[in-house]
Amino acid sequence: MRTYRSQAAAWMLALGLSAGLVACGSKGDTPQPTPKPTPTPQPKPTPTPRTFEWATCDVLIKEGHDHGHGNMHGNNVRRGLFYAQEQRFTLRNDGGGKVTLTWEDKLKDMPYFQAHQGGALFGMLFTFKDVKGKRVNDVLTELSDHYQIFFTIAEKDATGAIHEVKDLRTDKPIAWDHYTKAKPSIPTTTLEQRTKAIFEYVYRDTKDPYYEMKGDGDAKDHLLRIPGTQNLNKIGMKGHFKFLDRDWDWDEKGSPSQLASFYLKISLKQSTGPKFFKHDQHGLISSESYQPEPSIQWTTVFEVLLPVRVIANKRDLLKYPARYWNDMARAFKKTPEEMKENDETSEPGNDDSSFHM
């Protein structure tokens, strides 16, 4: 009996020790798995937009007149007229952002954009082509969230030398103070202000880049819009210029407007992200023609300098006709009498042109 109790006690003691060991071992002696840290979320890289590939570009400059609300109607081409109402040049993509400009043969003696002040509009149409000669404006339209053509006054010529805007009559630098003294006064301190003093450009890109507008009424249905808005998606394959005479009669003594001679810098730029930005009043918009939005990262696809000469002011025809014919004679190296006779004996003008923009 005594032996049995001793064995039972020893057995109970062993159980207690075993339980104690197990209990002690459960208080942290067993290695625990190290928790994996939560990975830090990485910013998603901005996808690189598709690049626009082109080989050549045919450009048409078409003279016209204003039909209101941004609509331009082309003038009919009058046979026999010295003055070219349609002007053409070609751009060739030489790679690396370099472009060669070649004027059509009939303009080889006057290789520059011949423009007028006094209300005339000048449409400019770009037709891009690939190496096989196929038109690719539709490709640029598909990529239009990232591409825009800008137009401004060049501050340097093709050699990199400083180039000032000059008055064609005097061949001297433009007197910018004529604009500031005019009524209303026009500021001309910055390049942006000077560009706006010399010309205006209106974008007229269409959903189908090859669509030819048939009149003023259908323009609003065919213009290219920013998705989800009625704001214009500005590319620059179609648009028109108006050259301004805001310094006309600047001294209230009948002084003429200055006729600007300058290089128009045409730049196709690509944005890293979407080119649209939010305006406080107008919502999502595109940049103005003379100023790429600074908050957006841009790269230049190509840049070309187009020589422009404003050869005369049509407004002078009404009040100062001798001045107008003298200016035209200077541009074409004729006498004023020859220029006037050419205008009177050439095919008369009419308003039947099918060209609308």
Language-model regions: role of each:
Residues 41-83, 356-357:
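N-terminal segment immediately downstream of the Sec signal-peptide cleavage site
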